[in-house]
Structures are given as structure tokens and as C-alpha cells.
Amino acid sequence: MNYYMNNGSSNAEENNKELNNEIKAVYESLEKRKDGTTRQTISNAIIVLENDPEFKGAIKRNELSCQTDIVKKMDWRRRSKSFTDTDFNNILLRMEKRYGITRDKNVKRAVDIVSNNNHYHPIIEKLEGLEWDGVVRVRHLLPKYLGTEESDYIY
């Protein structure tokens, strides 16, 4: 049974040919059984999470909170960035409809692997996004606040 062709598209997706082509390409890249059904493997679930246009780049591990976050806007109602059971159930539903992947244990493991490979730290990202204004401040920090003499040794 070809899950993509029979179950894979909602009406909105059918109107979007490019999205359908991307989903079809992901479906065709999955490992199949002799009867044409999708194999229920962790590696297939990882392929979907890393390549499906909806999931690609969405699942990341937050190194500050040590939790999995969804950092993209998704098609279902969400209350926070933190990964919830509702998020998992929606991902599983889409994997089942589009790709025939139904084994929730393997999808859970794939989410963990993908989020670990795509980690981020929100504070570091914020700091790396800032530009220095060119004003030297550190050189005068110790003399100003600790009363040390200004010299090249404490710069």
C-alpha cells in the first residue's frame, strides 16, 4: 500500500504542488518492504524529521534548559516552545498519514536523536547576534571597580 498516494495529503497540501513534491521525494527515499509498505525503523523516522518540509529544522535540543524544543511555527496549536505530548502526537499523526510510519517508540527515539544533533543555546545565539560598538570597556573594569592601577598587566 502506498501511504503517500492514498493517505498522505490534506486538501491544503493538494493545492500546493511544490510541497507535495517535497513530501513525495521524502516518501520515496524511505526504506520499504517487498510489499511496498514503509519499514518501521528509527532511520526512516529520522529521514522524515530531517527532510519533511514541515519538520526540517523544527526540532532542537535547548542546551540551557536541557529539553527538546520546537523552534518553527507548526500547523497545530502550541502554547510554548517546549516539546509536549501533543506535539509528539501531531508528529506521529502526520508521519502515519504521509509516510505510513506508525511505530511510536521509534518516532520517539528519532525525535531524541534529531533534537540532540540539532542543539542550540538561546543565550549564546543572542550574544553571537550582537555587534560590538567599538568602545573598549574591559580595559578600565578592574581600575574602576576594584581600585587597581591601570597597566598592561591587568588589561
Residue map of PLM features:
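Conserved NTP-binding/hydrolysis core of motor NTPases
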Residues: 143-155
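N-terminal nucleic-acid engagement/recognition segments and initiation subdomains in replication
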Residues: 1-136, 150-153
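Long, mid-chain structured domain cores
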Residues: 134-145
